[in-house]
Amino acid sequence: MKTLVVALGGNALLQRGEALTAENQYRNIASAVPALARLARSYRLAIVHGNGPQVGLLALQNLAWKEVEPYPLDVLVAESQGMIGYMLAQSLSAQPQMPHVTTVLTRIEVSPDDPAFLQPEKFIGPVYQPEEQEALEATYGWQMKRDGKYLRRVVASPQPRKILDSEAIELLLKEGHVVICSGGGGVPVTEDGAGSEAVIDKDLAAALLAEQINADGLVILTDADAVYENWGTPQQRAIRHATPDELAPFAKADGSMGPKVTAVSGYVRSRGKPAWIGALSRIEETLAGEAGTCISL
């Protein structure tokens, strides 16, 4: 049986602008898990998920309690792994004919000298109106940036260098478990074991995981059903197949597609195996080449 790493887009957990309630997340997860359950019957499946809204909520709750010093961001990322991993595991385990589902708290090494620490640009937390920027920055000391028509907090997002728990993940996969891991891009730690005040991009973490466990494929699921040429124009066209070199211009694109293209291209170049970008609702069609974008050499 082949091994597949699947990175879930944020819409699998929470729709943009939705309240960060457990009820909303369970409802979105319930829509996502049937397709994942079908995949789990055909592949050894490792599932990576984002945590941007959730870790931002934890940070807000953390700041609201004035009696103790706020917990660092790496601890909050670990908390979000437990929260989201539990919700996904509960929902997946309820599907018929599911193998055992296991959530692994995953640490990922980053460099303390990564230039990302000097230029935070990873969005976390809920969306705000632009007119709230000055008050939020003054109250919390946050850095804020535009995310579409909204405003969101940004934090450092260093490059993942090594998944410290990959051997355990690989062992569980070989034993037939569906493994939820590297949640929120993994808990960022430095070589000396210290936690790091950052959030790693989950797509880059998924690509690194696929490399380290020698997966047979990497799937990055997103709101868009493919990578598009001339996006947002009357001439837009879905790209069904491309090489990493052909997709290189898209890696520099603004928005969320750039890191996804960077992630899949790096994996394909490193391992020579295929990767896909597509919509969760069409994941089986994407793997069959009937939807999404397939990236290969």
UniProtKB/Swiss-Prot annotation:
<dbReference type="GO" id="GO:0005524">
    <property type="term" value="F:ATP binding"/>
</dbReference>
<keyword id="KW-0418">Kinase</keyword>
<dbReference type="GO" id="GO:0019546">
    <property type="term" value="P:arginine deiminase pathway"/>
</dbReference>
<protein>
    <recommendedName>
        <fullName>Carbamate kinase</fullName>
        <ecNumber>2.7.2.2</ecNumber>
    </recommendedName>
</protein>
<keyword id="KW-0547">Nucleotide-binding</keyword>
<dbReference type="InterPro" id="IPR001048">
    <property type="entry name" value="Asp/Glu/Uridylate_kinase"/>
</dbReference>
<comment type="pathway">
    <text>Nitrogen metabolism; (S)-allantoin degradation.</text>
</comment>
<dbReference type="InterPro" id="IPR003964">
    <property type="entry name" value="Carb_kinase"/>
</dbReference>
<comment type="similarity">
    <text>Belongs to the carbamate kinase family.</text>
</comment>
<keyword id="KW-0963">Cytoplasm</keyword>
<comment type="function">
    <text>Kinase involved in the anaerobic nitrogen utilization via the assimilation of allantoin. Catalyzes the transfer of a phosphate group from carbamoyl phosphate to ADP to produce ATP and leave carbamate, which spontaneously hydrolyzes to ammonia and hydrogencarbonate.</text>
</comment>
<dbReference type="Pfam" id="PF00696">
    <property type="entry name" value="AA_kinase"/>
</dbReference>
<dbReference type="GO" id="GO:0008804">
    <property type="term" value="F:carbamate kinase activity"/>
</dbReference>
<keyword id="KW-0067">ATP-binding</keyword>
<dbReference type="InterPro" id="IPR036393">
    <property type="entry name" value="AceGlu_kinase-like_sf"/>
</dbReference>
<dbReference type="GO" id="GO:0005829">
    <property type="term" value="C:cytosol"/>
</dbReference>
<keyword id="KW-0808">Transferase</keyword>
